[in-house]
From Swiss-Prot:
Region described as Connecting peptide: spans on this chain: 204-216
Entry's localization field: Membrane
Disulfide bonds: C132-C188
Protein name (database record): H-2 class II histocompatibility antigen, E-U alpha chain
Keyword Transmembrane helix tagged: yes
Main localization of the protein described in the UniProt heading: membrane
Residues that carry a glycan: N143
Membrane topology: Single-pass type I membrane protein
Extracellular side: 26-217
Signal peptide: 1-25
Alpha-2: annotated span: 110-203
Limits of the Ig-like C1-type domain: 112-204
Length: 255
């Protein structure tokens, strides 16, 4: 899906160094990232804060609302969404200028890597969550579709915003709540400007192969037998060593 697009991306890094009060030696290093972008031809932007790789909050541009990743965060801090909207407006204006100066050269497309896994160990009949992890891609635009038995699923789905990486690429998580069953299989289909065709990752329940009881007994018996043989051989070698030493001592005494 090769689509020409333009992207203005700004990263601001704030390093927070935590030091020990006793030794004044630096023990840990944390990073807060303010990431914002405006994208064409989608005509959309994003504004978010990240702490050590985890989202703190982002601003819903359409609703002019600050969305905290965890509700508890809002009890300790606040952020006015209007500030983010002002930044996005500046990004849009700057992008228009940069497009003209660069002769409308589009940003390079980097195709994503996609992984599908369950959030927790899967047990039949127990609710769980499938995670579609989309990583190492640019620009920040993807279309994601969950499929169950080949059919699109729209209920029980959620997603994160685009999360920045240290290498200026992006990552994103999509989630699907599901009830594990041997009759169902799932796919996460990802479309991106860097892909020639949508990339689909498959997941289905796989029963754990348990070792039959008879084989377990054979393995245990074999292990016990090998252990006993080792003990017997060890005792024989020790006894031979003692006898050999006694013979040598007697000969030396006779001399």
């Amino acid at each position: 899906m090769a689509t020409i697009g333009a992207l203005l991306l700004r990263f601001f890094f704030i390093a927070v160094l935590m030091s020990s009060q006793k030794s004044w030696a630096i023990k840990e290093e944390h990073t807060i990232i303010q990431a914002e972008f405006y994208l064409l031809p989608d005509k959309r932007g994003e504004y978010m804060f990240d702490f050590d790789g985890d989202e703190i909050f982002h601003v819903d541009i359409e609703k002019s609302e600050t969305i905290w990743r965890l509700e508890e965060f809002a009890k300790f801090a606040s952020f006015e969404a209007q500030g983010a909207l002002a930044n996005i407006a500046v990004d849009k204006a700057n992008l228009d200028v940069m497009k003209k100066r660069s002769n409308n050269t589009p940003d390079a497309n980097v195709a994503p890597e996609v992984t599908v896994l369950s959030r927790s160990p899967v047990n039949l009949g127990e609710p769980n969550i499938l995670v579609c992890f989309i990583d190492k891609f640019s620009p920040p635009v993807v279309n994601v579709t969950w499929l169950r038995n080949g059919q699109p699923v729209t209920e029980g789905v959620s997603e994160t915003v685009f999360l920045p990486r240290d290498d200026h690429l992006f990552r994103k998580f999509h989630y699907l709540t599901f009830l594990p069953s041997t009759d169902d299989f799932y796919d996460c289909e990802v479309d991106h400007w860097g892909l020639e065709e949508p990339l689909r990752k498959h997941w289905e329940f796989e029963e754990k192969t348990l070792l039959p009881e008879t084989k377990e007994n054979v393995v245990c018996a074999l292990g016990l037998f090998v252990g006993l043989v080792g003990i017997v051989v060890g005792i024989i070698l020790i006894m031979k060593g003692i006898k050999k030493r006694n013979v040598v001592e007697r000969r030396q005494g006779a001399l």
